[in-house]
Amino acid sequence: MLIFVGTLVTLLSVFGGYALEGGHLGALVQPVEILMIAGAGIGAFILGNGVKTIKSTLLVIPTLFKGSKYNKDVYMELMGLLYVLLAKARKEGTLTLESDIEDPHKSPIFSQYPKLLADHHIVEFMTDYLRLMVGGNMNAFEIESLMDEEIETHHVEGEAPALALQKVGDAMPAFGIVAAVMGVVHTMASADQPPAILGEMIAQALVGTFLGILISYGFIGPLSSVAEQRVAEQTKMFQCIKVTILASLNGYAPAIAVEFGRKVLFSTERPSFSELEEHVRRVKAK
């Protein structure tokens, strides 16, 4: 929603201001300039990225126009799920978790948290390390090291679309200049035309520079920032799972382990101690 608001504010400010000072909006409509700038940007994007990055970027872009799914309620659900699983392991033994982690979609515990179950990255990360915990062949230090490596790998993969968008955005002003120079060349080749026509041709050429800068800093740059923020939010989910499981492996009770997880969350989404305590009580009562 905020993306649409930001886009509307940008367009109204730029084009509205131009119209208020007496400019003719029709002069800014230059399909050929748009074709040159957009085509060069798309070509550079394809040239500078592999198939994997191109696919992931195309998949990420539509999600940017939706609100973030990682909010306070989701984090509360995550800590509630972790508490239930760790409490079951502590009370009935870690081997009792096998049926839940082998097929989470059929697990009566996981099925109570459909939002989390829909995120296969989160479910896979959680079940993989619970499986290692059940196996009992690795200590907490080894599991922590492995978790750090996987989180770093995920972060690098997740950042690829944001970096790809950022590089294209950074290049758009230059492509705008290219389009403008091409327009100036065309104008100079038509030096025998009347001044009125030459003035119109120069104005058309300058639109290229304007569009390149506007597209870069008004649209593509902000989208790359949103993509980067979404990666950071998902990474925070992994970190919450990590510290909670490690706290359990180090002997802390489930209620204390989820408190470890709470402390790593961003302050804007982090529940208070009493909120988490009350949530754990409700989970216990189920």
PLM features per residue range, with description:
Residues 5-8, 12-25, 143-146, 150-229:
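Helix-termination/interfacial motifs at the ends of transmembrane alpha-helices
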Residues 1-9, 32-36:
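Alpha-helical transmembrane segments of integral membrane proteins
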Residues 20-161, 233-286:
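Large intracellular
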